[in-house]
Curated annotation (Swiss-Prot):
Residues 109-175 form the S4 RNA-binding domain. It comes from Bos taurus (Bovine). Pfam families: Ribosomal_S4 (PF00163), S4 (PF01479). The gene is IMP3. This is U3 small nucleolar ribonucleoprotein protein IMP3. GO terms for biological process: ribosomal small subunit biogenesis; rRNA processing.
Length: 184
C-alpha cells in the first residue's frame, strides 16, 4: 500500500508531466564529456561550448562574405592562425576546420590532458592531482588550476617543478639525478 501524499508533495507533482517528458541528449553528452576529461566544474564545459559556438558562428559569417573580399581573406587567415596556435585545429589548411571546433577541442588542450599526452601521467585523474598539488609548471610559473589551457608554443615548456618529489623519483629511475641540484 502506498501512503497518501502530503499537500506539498501533491503541489510538486502537479508541475511534472510524466506522460510527455523530454529527454535532453545534451545532458548525457555533457556528462560524458565531464567524466571523460575529468572536468570538475560544469561552468568550464559551458564556457568551452560557448566559445566553440562563437568560433563556428564567426567562421560561418566569414564564409558568407564574397570570396574575393580582402577582409574575408585577412580575417579567415587570422582566425585559422589563432585556432592553430591554440591547438584547436590540426592544420591551418581551410576554413572548414573551424566547423569541427567543439568543447572537446578545448578540453583536449587543458593541462592535465596535455600531461597525459606527454606521458607525464598514466591516468587523467592522476594528472589532475599532480596539477592541483603543484607538481607541474608551464614555463617559469607553477600552475595549480587544471582548467589552464596550454597553447602549442607552451606545450614544450610543460615540466615538473624543481622541488617536486615526482621529478626526483623520475630522475632516480632514469639514473639522471644530480645530488647537487636537488638538495633544495
Amino acid at each position: 500500500m502506498v501512503r497518501k501524499l502530503k499537500f506539498h508533495e501533491q503541489k510538486l507533482l502537479k508541475q511534472v508531466d510524466f506522460l510527455n517528458w523530454e529527454v535532453t541528449d545534451h545532458n548525457l553528452h555533457e556528462l560524458r564529456v565531464l567524466r571523460r576529461y575529468r572536468l570538475q566544474r560544469r561552468e568550464d564545459y559551458t564556457r568551452y561550448n560557448q566559445l566553440s559556438r562563437a568560433v563556428r558562428e564567426l567562421a560561418r559569417r566569414l564564409r558568407d562574405l564574397p570570396e574575393r573580399d580582402p577582409f574575408r581573406v585577412r580575417s579567415s587567415a587570422a582566425l585559422l592562425d589563432k585556432l592553430y596556435a591554440l591547438g584547436l585545429v590540426p592544420t591551418r589548411g581551410s576554413q572548414e576546420l573551424c566547423d569541427f571546433v567543439t568543447a572537446s577541442s578545448f578540453c583536449r588542450r587543458r593541462l592535465p590532458t596535455v600531461l597525459l599526452k606527454l606521458r607525464m601521467a598514466q591516468h587523467l585523474q592522476a594528472a589532475v592531482a599532480f596539477v592541483e598539488q603543484g607538481h607541474v609548471r608551464v614555463g617559469p610559473d607553477v600552475v595549480t588550476d587544471p582548467a589552464f589551457l596550454v597553447t602549442r608554443s607552451m606545450e614544450d615548456f610543460v615540466t615538473w617543478v624543481d622541488s617536486s618529489k615526482i621529478k626526483r623519483h623520475v630522475l632516480e629511475y632514469n639514473e639522471e639525478r644530480d645530488d647537487f641540484d636537488l638538495d633544495a
